[in-house]
Swiss-Prot record:
Keyword terms of this UniProt record: Cytoplasm, Cytoskeleton
Protein name, UniProt field: Cilia-and flagella-associated protein 96
Compartment list: Cytoplasm, Cytoskeleton, Microtubule organizing center, Centrosome
Pfam families registered for this protein in UniProt: CFAP96-like (PF15239)
Signal peptide location: none
Family, as annotated: Belongs to the CFAP96 family.
Primary subcellular site in the record, as a coarse category: cytoplasm
Organism for this UniProt entry: Bos taurus
GO CC list: centrosome; cytoplasmic microtubule
Entry keyword annotation includes Cytoplasm: yes
Region annotated Disordered, chain positions: 225-251
């Protein structure tokens, strides 16, 4: 038996271990690029075993190929079953068309007079009947002749008389404006009234306003000040070492602990927790190696020409 938390020899060899579990849609990763113990660094740690999906590989079974469970059970082909059903349904179809026993019966529904007492009415017959030639009636008497148009472009058709033509002067508007200006100037009495006295202002003058020019502005002389030389700040204090330049004095040494640590009672009888193991690896042979093993044997290894991929 292995030590506590270890693996058995069968689990280390991996030939008779439990079948591998895979998920749908995972891409194939070669064993050279696959990291060692990937489950210890990715995803959540120390999880109990959940639902697993069995793989479709044949490595976990005793037989190399799948064997039928029941003896004498045959393979069912869905295409063959569907074709047999179609053939059985085709046998139900009749070769000849269906013929009635008593022949065709005359219709006696809407529009038919078969079986009635009086028979067909000649008035409702669909045949064409001779008709007399149509003569349209004459027009009524007119009391007044029709109007000629709407009046525009037609002479002497309106209620009143036509307007007589009267020619206008070429400068009629200019002459009328001139007459109005002359009449306006005739009504004027003289020129505009002008007062010969000194004009006085409506408000008093501003007492705070002076017409004298202001004196020039005196410029204040600035004294040149010589600044102190630049002095960089002192570097940051480091932990440890001499503390003479700090604000507070260095604390004195104290041998007493700040908090007394309590001893936790340990129960040696309790079992040690071991996390569940990760996925187990199996030795899988490459497809290229299988191709080489099948193509080369002890009989044709001298004359064989294997295609390289």
């Amino acid at each position: 038996m292995p030590a506590e938390g270890g693996k058995t020899d069968m689990e280390r060899i991996g030939l008779f271990s439990e079948m591998e579990y895979i998920t749908v849609g995972d891409k194939y990763v070669s064993q050279f690029n696959r990291p060692f113990n990937e489950s210890a660094s990715k995803n959540r740690q120390i999880l109990p075993g959940g639902s697993k999906e069995m793989s479709n590989l044949q490595a976990g079974y005793f037989d190399p190929h799948f064997v039928r469970i029941f003896e004498g059970e045959s393979y069912v082909n869905p295409n063959q079953v569907r074709r047999r059903y179609m053939m059985e349904e085709a046998k139900k179809n009749l070769s000849k068309a269906f013929l009635p026993s008593n022949g065709e019966k005359k219709p006696c529904g809407l529009g038919s007079y078969y079986g009635t007492i009086g028979g067909p009415v000649p008035f409702f017959s669909a045949q064409s009947k001779p008709k007399e030639k149509y003569e349209p009636p004459g027009k009524n008497l007119y009391t007044n002749p029709g109007k000629k148009g709407t009046g525009y472009g037609y002479a002497n058709i309106t209620i009143g008389k036509q307007f007589s033509h009267s020619s206008d002067l070429y400068d009629a508007a200019k002459l009328n404006n001139k007459k109005e200006n002359e009449e306006h100037r005739r009504l004027l009495k003289g020129t505009a009234f002008k007062l010969n006295l000194y004009t006085r202002e409506y408000f008093d003058t501003n007492p705070y306003m002076s017409e004298k020019p202001l004196p020039p502005i005196k410029k204040v002389e600035k004294k040149e000040t010589v600044g102190n030389p630049f002095k960089p700040s002192s570097p940051g204090k480091k932990a440890g070492g001499m503390k003479a330049g700090t604000f507070d004095p260095y604390p004195s040494h104290s041998a007493d602990p700040y908090v007394v640590k309590l001893k936790s009672p340990s129960s040696k009888s309790a079992k040690v927790f071991h996390p569940p193991g990760g996925p187990k690896s199996r030795p899988i042979e490459s497809i290229m190696a299988l191709n080489v093993k099948r193509a080369l044997n002890m009989k044709n290894y001298k004359t064989a020409s294997v295609q390289s991929y």
